[in-house]
């Protein structure tokens, strides 16, 4: 079991966690998040992941490994959850084959 632990690698290198943390804390990203979502970004998870990655590289801590795995699973699950912008159609509109009235104004 100890041999399999030594071969495990974090899903991302520690440099990537560090660059994600720097990006999250950047002024440009903070402005974008505030403009888009109305709140400042929460960079705590990137910081914790970076610290866990460094801890794994130094000590091969099982707690750091489990924390990184759980964080990545949560991150992937959050990416899969989204609200579709458009309502998906089950069938095409009934008048899809008719020509468009480009010269005439449409009724409101």
From Swiss-Prot:
- The primary site where this protein sits is other
Annotated Gene Ontology cellular components are:
synapse; synaptic cleft
Q: Which GO terms describe its biological process?
A: negative regulation of long-term synaptic potentiation; regulation of synaptic plasticity
Task: Give the compositionally biased regions (Basic and acidic residues).
Answer: 67-81
Subcellular localization, as worded in the UniProt entry: Synapse; Synaptic cleft
Keywords per UniProt: Secreted, Synapse
Q: How is it modified after translation?
A: Rapidly degraded by proteolysis following neuronal stimulation, resulting in increased AMPA receptor clustering.
Q: State if Secreted is listed as a keyword.
A: yes
Question: According to the UniProt record, where is the region Disordered?
Answer: 58-108
What domain of life is recorded for the organism? Answer: Eukaryota
> Function, please?
Negatively regulates long-term potentiation and modulates adult synaptic plasticity.
The UniProt family comment states: Belongs to the UPF0545 family.
In Swiss-Prot or TrEMBL terms, this protein is called Synaptic plasticity regulator PANTS
């Amino acid at each position: 079991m100890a041999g399999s632990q030594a071969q495990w690698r974090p899903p991302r290198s520690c440099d990537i966690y560090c660059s994600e943390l720097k990006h999250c804390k950047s002024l440009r990203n903070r402005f974008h998040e505030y403009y888009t979502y109305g709140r400042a970004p929460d960079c705590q998870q990137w910081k914790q992941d970076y610290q866990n990655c460094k801890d794994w590289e130094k000590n091969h801590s099982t707690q750091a490994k489990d924390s990184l795995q759980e964080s990545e699973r949560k991150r992937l699950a959050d990416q899969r959850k989204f609200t579709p912008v458009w309502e998906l159609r089950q069938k095409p509109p009934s008048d899809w084959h008719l020509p468009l009235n480009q010269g005439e104004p449409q009724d409101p």
